[in-house]
Amino acid sequence: MALNINKKNYRLADMSISPDESVPYPDPDETAEIIEDKIDMAECGTIWHVREWRGDDGLVEQFALMLNVTSAHPAYSRCQQLKGNQHNFDQVRRTDTWHSSVHSHQYFIDCEDCDREVHHELAGGREEEKSRRVVNGSFKKHYDGMLYTQFDYLERWKRGKP
């Protein structure tokens, strides 16, 4: 083999491999252990659903939180009216990481573009560790918001997105 006279480091690039920054954040592993909980908060007129997937280090890597309004909630008839004849008209808010982003679905809000609000884009590959921290932080924020300051959370929903 001839010597490399130019002293350059030639590397063959595999064009079939996408750049690292385009690697998507992984979807939840439905076969992995999932922590699920349902909390009936009758005094608030809500039912709160929690699903979380944790990594080996205890960080929440995926989550789904849903706050449902029951018929005991003062806003129930308004929710029913705004949602129409759909069977799931009592759903107020759901926050999850299903589609490579941390996002919120907000229903019944009288504002434009109220169905989805994107908070953070997530990435895999080199950026996955940073994305995991974003997911874990978002989980704590929404978890605490729904559990400890639920009335503030519902007021925000009634007013629309800030």
Give the label of every model feature segment.
Residues 2, 31-32, 36, 57, ...:
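Intrinsically disordered, low-complexity regions
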Residues 111-161:
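Acidic, low-complexity intrinsically disordered segments
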Residues 21, 30-37, 43, 52, ...:
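Glutamate identity and glutamate-enriched acidic tracts
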Residues 62-115:
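Acidic, aromatic-enriched beta-alpha/helix-loop junctions
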Residues 7, 22, 60, 86, ...:
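Generic intrinsically disordered, low-complexity segments enriched for polar/acidic and small residues
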Residues 2-81:
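Negatively charged, low-complexity tracts enriched in Asp/Glu with abundant Ser/Thr
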